[in-house]
Regions:
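Short, polar N-cap/turn motifs at the start of nucleic acid-interacting alpha helices
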Residues: 110, 177-184, 265, 284-306, ...
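Conserved tyrosine-mediated DNA breakage-rejoining catalytic core shared by Y-recombinases
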Residues: 114-118, 129, 172-224, 298
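Basic/aromatic-enriched alpha-helical hairpins
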Residues: 6-10, 15-82, 98-101, 119-120, ...
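Catalytic-site neighborhood detector that most strongly recognizes the C-terminal catalytic loop/helix
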Residues: 122, 130, 187-194, 219, ...
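Short, charged hinge/linker segments at domain and secondary-structure junctions
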Residues: 2-12, 66-69, 100-123, 188, ...
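DNA breakage-rejoining catalytic core of tyrosine-based enzymes
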Residues: 19-23, 62-66, 108-110, 122-141, ...
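Basic, Lys/Arg- and aromatic-enriched nucleic-acid-binding interface segment
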Residues: 81-94, 104-173, 181, 191, ...
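Short, basic (Lys/Arg/His-rich) helix/loop patches that form interaction surfaces
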Residues: 141-153, 212, 224-243, 249-292, ...
Length: 347
C-alpha cells in the first residue's frame, strides 16, 4: 500500500466508513431469520428472542467480514459460563447457519463458524421418568381411582397412556382431528393458534401430520370425553374457559395426586417410553414401524419427506390395538409383553 502511496491507516478508516449496514452481523442474521419460512411462528419468535438476548449484544454490530472463530468461541463460552448449556449448543447451530447465509449472499468467502463443535460442554439430555412395565397394574389402578379432580382429567391421563402422544399434541387437540369412522386421529403439522395461549399453534412435533390409529379402547375413551366436551372445539378445554385448553401441568399434577413423583417416578411424557419399551419387548413389531408411531425424528432427510404418508399404517393399527389390549391385560397383574397376543396379531 505504501508503494502505491496509500496510507494504511487512512485506507482502513475509509473502509470502515464504507461499510454497508447489510454487512453488519445483526442485519445478516435478521435477513437469514426472515428467509426461513418453514418455521412455525413460535419457533421464529423464540429464535429471534435468543438472538436479541445472547448474540446481538456481543457481535451484532460487527461486520461479518471481520468475524473470526475466536469471536464465536468467546460468545459460546460466555453463554456456557451462565449455565445455559442448551442455549450454548443451539447458539452454535444458529451461528453456523447465519454465517453460511452470509457466504451464500457472497458477503464473505468462508464460514468461520462452521467447526465449533466441542467448544462448550454438551447439554445434559433431559430425562423423562417412566415406570417399569411391572408397575403397570398399579398405575392403571391409580388412574381408575382418581376422583380428586375433574373427570375430564382422568380421561386425559388414560387417553394419553393409550395413544402415547406428546403433551402439546394432546392439550391443543381439536375434535375435527378425530375420525371416529376410520378410527384415526390425524395431528396436523400446525394448528390454529388460540389467542392468548402460548404455543397453541403447535401440531405434531416433527411439523408434519402425524397419524394415530385409535384402538377400540381409545375410541371408547374419546366417546366418554365427547359426552363432556363435544360441543367445544377443543377436546380438552380448561376448567374455567372452554375456549382455552387445559393447563399444561394437568396430567402431571394428576399423577402427583396419585402419589407419583413426576421428576423421579413417572410423568406424562414417560408414557411414551413405557409404550415403546413394551412394543419392542413384544417382538411383534419392526423397529421402523415403532419409530414411525412414536413420531421420532427421521435422520434421513430423503425419508423425512414421506413420514406424513401412511407409512406402516396397517402394522401401526394392529400395534395400537395390541398396546391397548396389553394395558387391559395388565389391569389385574403384570404380564411380560412377549406373552401377549402373538396368536391374535401374527398370522
Amino acid at each position: 500500500m505504501l508503494a502505491l502511496n496509500i496510507n494504511p491507516v487512512q485506507q482502513r478508516a475509509a473502509e470502515r466508513g464504507s461499510r454497508t449496514p447489510e454487512k453488519v452481523f445483526k442485519n445478516v442474521a435478521l435477513a437469514w431469520h426472515k428467509s426461513n419460512r418453514k418455521w412455525s411462528q413460535n419457533t421464529a419468535d423464540r429464535l429471534l428472542a435468543s438472538l436479541n438476548n445472547h448474540i446481538f449484544p456481543v457481535i451484532g454490530n460487527l461486520p461479518v467480514s471481520e468475524l473470526k472463530p475466536r469471536h464465536f468461541i468467546d460468545l459460546q463460552k460466555g453463554i456456557e459460563e451462565k449455565g445455559l448449556l442448551e442455549v450454548a449448543s443451539r447458539t452454535r447451530q444458529h451461528l453456523s447457519n447465519i454465517i453460511r447465509h452470509a457466504v451464500h449472499q457472497e458477503l464473505i468467502d468462508t464460514n468461520p463458524a462452521a467447526n465449533l463443535g466441542g467448544v462448550t460442554t454438551p447439554p445434559v439430555r433431559r430425562h423423562y421418568p417412566a415406570l417399569p412395565l411391572e408397575r403397570l397394574p398399579e398405575l392403571l389402578e391409580r388412574i381408575g381411582a382418581y376422583h380428586q379432580g375433574r373427570e375430564l382429567t382422568r380421561h386425559a391421563v388414560l387417553l394419553m397412556l393409550h395413544v402415547f402422544i406428546r403433551s402439546s399434541e394432546l392439550r391443543f387437540a381439536r375434535w375435527s382431528e378425530i375420525d371416529f369412522t376410520n378410527r384415526v386421529w390425524t395431528i396436523p403439522a400446525t394448528r390454529e393458534p388460540i389467542i392468548g395461549v402460548h404455543y397453541s399453534g403447535r401440531g405434531a412435533k416433527m411439523r408434519m401430520p402425524h397419524i394415530v390409529p385409535l384402538s377400540e379402547q381409545s375410541i371408547a375413551i374419546l366417546k366418554q370425553i365427547k359426552d363432556i366436551t363435544g360441543n367445544n372445539e377443543l377436546i380438552f378445554p380448561g376448567d374455567h374457559n372452554p375456549y382455552k385448553p387445559m393447563c399444561e401441568n394437568t396430567v402431571n399434577k394428576a399423577l402427583r395426586v396419585m402419589g407419583y413423583d413426576t421428576k423421579k417416578d413417572i410423568c406424562g411424557h414417560g408414557f411414551r417410553a413405557m409404550a415403546c419399551s413394551a412394543l419392542m419387548e413384544s417382538g411383534l413389531w419392526a423397529k421402523d414401524a415403532v419409530e414411525r408411531q412414536m413420531s421420532h425424528q427421521e435422520r434421513n432427510t430423503v425419508r423425512m419427506a414421506y413420514i406424513h404418508k401412511a407409512e406402516h399404517l396397517e402394522a401401526r393399527k394392529a400395534m395400537m390395538q395390541w398396546w391397548s389390549d396389553y394395558l387391559e391385560a395388565c389391569r389385574e397383574s403384570y404380564a411380560p409383553p412377549y406373552t401377549i397376543g402373538k396368536n391374535k396379531f401374527i398370522p
